[in-house]
A protein has these predicted regions:
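N-terminal, positively charged/glycine-rich alpha-helical extensions of SAM-dependent methyltransferases
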Residues: 1-25
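Conserved alpha-helix/loop element of class I SAM-dependent methyltransferases that forms part
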Residues: 26-47
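Class I SAM-dependent methyltransferase SAM/SAH-binding core
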Residues: 50, 54-98
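A short acidic, Gly/Pro-enriched loop at the edge of an enzyme's catalytic core
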Residues: 94-109
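A short SAM/SAH-binding and catalytic strip from SAM-dependent methyltransferases
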Residues: 108-119
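A short glycine-rich, Lys/Arg-flanked "PGG" loop and its adjoining helix->strand segment in the class I
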Residues: 122-134
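Conserved class I S-adenosyl-L-methionine
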Residues: 139-164
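Core SAM-dependent methyltransferase catalytic element
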Residues: 182-214
Length: 214
């Protein structure tokens, strides 16, 4: 997928959502960042948090207990017209493959429904591991689908977590069915375990909490 086409598709999607919603909602993000990973809000106390592929909704607006809350998105500058300039969280306009931050800058790095949107997943994972401090946490949630789409050019599989080794270890992993169309968070909240004995081709959702060891 050409970069320009992908950018246009992403921006068109968010403009259509704003038209449909009036104002882009973000009320479910606290739950999305905590419940699926077995965490409480207090886990984010005084933490430096980076959300990869944050989009324009304000994914970290809820986290006013964090020391630093930054959203990274290659379209962050364009999202100002969608209202991000009114948010309290900070934004960095850059791709995951080139995170503009020193090594170990963050206590928590999250990628919720974004790692399949990148252009180079191996470069992205390398950067995520670099940006999180030793002992820090990576929160990962992603759709697993059979075919690429204009905005999701990367096809991930259940063995995705192997790519985070040897620096990181998976502490908590869930394989879930995608039981709701559209908003993947609703399927995660539903928590239906993925039946690997069912041979039917379908979406799945991988949820994992990883820790950087070295």
């Amino acid at each position: 997928v050409a970069v320009a086409d992908k950018t246009l598709a992403e921006l068109d999607y968010w403009k259509s959502r704003r038209s449909a919603e009036g104002r882009l909602a973000n009320h479910w993000y606290e739950r999305a960042f905590t419940e699926p990973f077995g965490l409480k809000r207090e886990f984010f106390d005084a933490k430096r948090v980076l959300d990869i592929g944050c989009g324009p909704r304000g994914s970290l607006e809820w986290a006013d207990n964090a020391a630093v809350r930054v959203g990274l998105d290659p379209l962050a500058d364009l999202y100002r017209e969608l209202g991000t300039d009114q948010h309290k969280m900070s934004y960095l306009s850059a791709p995951c493959e080139r995170i503009p931050a020193p090594d170990g800058s963050f206590d928590i790095v999250s990628t919720l429904n974004s790692i399949d949107h990148v252009d180079d997943i191996d470069a992205c994972i390398k950067e995520i591991k670099r940006a999180v401090r030793v002992g820090g946490t990576i929160l990962l949630m992603t759709d697993l689908h059979e075919e690429p789409t204009p905005t999701e050019p990367v096809v991930c599989s259940w063995d995705l977590l192997d790519r985070f080794r040897p620096e990181c270890i998976a502490v908590f992993v869930r394989h879930l069915e995608k039981v709701h169309k559209g908003n993947g968070h609703e399927s995660v909240f539903a928590g239906v375990h993925y039946d690997h004995t069912n041979p039917a081709t379908r979406y799945g959702i991988l949820v994992a909490l990883l820790q950087r060891l070295v």
